[in-house]
Structure formats: C-alpha cells, structure tokens
Amino acid sequence: MTVYNDIIEKLKRKKIHMTLIDPASQDIESSGRIAEAAERAGTDFIMIGGSTRINSELMDKTIGAIKSKTSLKTIIFPGSPEMISPRADAIYYMSLMNSRNIDFIIGHQVKTSLFLRQLAIETIPMAYLIFEPGMTVGRVGEANLIKRDDSDTALLYALAAETFGMKLVYLESGSGSPTYVSENVIKKIKEYVKIPVIVGGGIRDKNAAEKLAAAGADIIVTGTIVERSRNVYEALQEIISSI
C-alpha cells in the first residue's frame, strides 16, 4: 500500500496525527528516540524536515535512525531540493502557493522531478499555504501571508489546489508560532474541498488540537513540542488522545 493510500484508509476510521522531526534540531540518535516515543504515544506517520540547513547525508542518517527505532512510515517534508533521501517512504511534492518566489511555487519542483522519478520514491502532491505570523518559514519562503482568520482567501487557494489535482492541502502558521490557523478557516475550506486538510504550527496542547480537529482538520502535525519536551511520550499522548 502506498503512503498516500495508507493516509486515506486511516482517515476513514479516525483523525491522523503526524510527528515532525527536524534533523537539524537534535543529534541523529535523539531523532530516533523521538520517533520511538512518538510511535508509543500513537502518532501515525513521521515527517522529516522543516529546516533549510539540511543536506541529503543528514537526511539519510536521520531516516535510518528513525527506521531503526520505529515501524512507522516516513515522509520527507522538504525545505530545499537537497533534502531528498531514497530511504524515506514518500516525499511531499509540495508547492508553496502563496510565495512571491516562483522557485517555491514550481522552480524547485521542476529541478528535482527527474531525480525523484529515478529514485522511484513515492511523491504526494501537496499545496502548502502559510498563514500569519508565518515565522521563519514565512520569511524564508517569501510568503504573502494569509491572515489567520481570512477564510475567503484561504478557501480560494485550497480550491485552486484541489483543481490542480493536489492530493493534500497543508495550512501552516509556522514552527513555534504563538497562534494556529483559525477554526473558521478550516470549517470554510471543509465546506467545499474534498482533499484532506493538514494543519500545523502553534499546536502546543490538547485544547488546540481538539479545537482544530473538531473544526474539520483531518491531520494534525506537531513538531516544536517534541523538540522542547522532556517527556515526548506524555506530551504527544495527551495531544493525540484529544483528536
């Protein structure tokens, strides 16, 4: 079964939680331990990426460490073309649709298309939308930030993504964001869009996760919390049980 089909099958039964591990935020062995704790807590998939300062060697070693500790499928969340590894189960073939820089919309994707085909890694087409405050990813990605409660603009982007044939749409507030995407934005998108909606950024506790899931988010992503928590299992288990 492909990773994407696995996602769709799981969504028929429940909401999904994904743990984002940034290889640049801790040593390789710690990445493996985080993944192990996340699996015990009930996370469904491991995303690897986030930073732009990651090369393919670090990705290879990090994914290897994660796979040695967990049976969960791994998905690359690329911040640059250098973050491709054949060891992952899949990669988000993502377009930062509200960027001012064409490289983030389609340029990097064109440059890596042949390489990805040669690797025979599963690609999952995904629209990536960055909302205020955006944090580092908004700055680096040169995003025209969508206001966190601007449901009309968000809906138009999401509809365009679905019309393009994207299989997922990711609503991002930015790693370490003090706020998360408004529930009203998610509700509006879910009224019209049939592809799964991922929400990440600013989700620090079960209350936030519960609200976003109730609003219609299909997939909840948490990353900063696993980097900062002394007990990854407890921190994630509380969030995962709430969705």
From Swiss-Prot:
Its EC number is 2.5.1.41. InterPro entries: GGGP/HepGP_synthase_I (IPR039074), GGGP/HepGP_synthase_sf (IPR038597), GGGP_HepGP_synthase (IPR008205), GGGP_synth (IPR010946). Keywords: Cytoplasm, Lipid biosynthesis, Lipid metabolism, Magnesium, Metal-binding, Phospholipid biosynthesis, Phospholipid metabolism, Transferase. One of its GO terms (molecular function) is phosphoglycerol geranylgeranyltransferase activity. It is an enzyme of class 2 (transferase). Pfam families: PcrB. The keyword rRNA processing does not apply. GO terms for cellular component: cytoplasm. Pathway: Membrane lipid metabolism; glycerophospholipid metabolism. Sn-glycerol 1-phosphate binds at residues 170-176, 201-202, 223-224. It catalyses: sn-glycerol 1-phosphate + (2E,6E,10E)-geranylgeranyl diphosphate = sn-3-O-(geranylgeranyl)glycerol 1-phosphate + diphosphate. It comes from the Archaea. Its cofactor is Mg(2+). GO terms for biological process: glycerophospholipid biosynthetic process. Mg(2+) binds at residues 22, 51. Gene3D superfamilies: FMN-linked oxidoreductases. It is found in: Cytoplasm. SUPFAM superfamilies: FMN-linked oxidoreductases (SSF51395). Prenyltransferase that catalyzes the transfer of the geranylgeranyl moiety of geranylgeranyl diphosphate (GGPP) to the C3 hydroxyl of sn-glycerol-1-phosphate (G1P). This reaction is the first ether-bond-formation step in the biosynthesis of archaeal membrane lipids. Belongs to the GGGP/HepGP synthase family. Group II subfamily. This is Geranylgeranylglyceryl phosphate synthase. It comes from Picrophilus torridus (strain ATCC 700027 / DSM 9790 / JCM 10055 / NBRC 100828 / KAW 2/3).
